[in-house]
Amino acid sequence: MRVDQLTEHLPPEEIERPKAWTRDTISSDRWLIPVSEACVAELDQLVASLRRDPRPVESLAPAAFSLRACSDLMSEVRAKLETDTGLAVVDRFPVERYETEENRAIGWLLAAMLGQVVAQKANGARLYDVKDTGQALGYGVRRSVTNLGQPFHTDGGWLWKAPNFVGLFCLESALEGGLSRFTSLVTAHNALRRRRPDLLARLYTPFAWDRQGEHAPDDGRASEHPVFEYEGGVLAARYYEDYIVNGHRLAGTALDDLGREALVALRAIVDDEASWVEFRIEKGQLQYLNNRQFAHSRTAFKDADTPQKGGGRHMLRLWNRDEGSWHLEGRPAT
């Protein structure tokens, strides 16, 4: 179907109003959720249990422990992600009381209360450490393991099934920088619908995506997905301009002029300071985002310790996906 034909079938001009916020229409009281004393007490009991009977983190299931208050907390998080702001920051867990592996267990169990925790790498790793490893940015080395800033993006946009939700559990904050930014792709979609429906229509057709080397050796290095999809009255988005530009290079296909113009127009909207909120994620906070309707970025940061010493900014990242398998792409295992 041609782009001009697609324009006739775009969604309504204004969609998903609770999620179509801007900097001036949202405040921190809408995304902050306090941790109850009851939940902290449950976590203290959980850690005591694991010290008596250590088990592999990924073998742990919420139902095996008494975590009713924490489960109620994560139900509140999910409600914000699905029907409200699309962003939730839980403030905060006493991570300083626990060892790193115990905090990993806490992060895993909290994420599991939201639903299926899925792989973030082709090797099946479901717990992903976001920290500066000292590696230079290059093919197969994501910005998440450097101290570089990141442009606005959604996670896993190259996958067959991108994660529904992305969580960051802050085990240590940076000495300087590392600020988190969030923007509504629903708002951006609405703006393009009003201003340039022809460019929005192009974003509903496929682009090549860099798969980041996270695939079998004999698989293609790029996949194909649109930026926007609209089905059953629900908008879904995948966004990472760098991965699209690199994807076309890897696929050996030229990025068309209309596609390039559409990406530039979308970037101008999400990069506009009026479109995003910014704050520092503090030690002990758990940040969750609706990854299919919101994009996030971070500023560059500086750590007190070098990566080689094992210190510095450390986030435990978790992906949740409601459908498909737990494997990276979400396809059934073969």
Kindly label every feature range from the protein language model.
Residues 107-118:
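A short alpha->loop->secondary-structure connector
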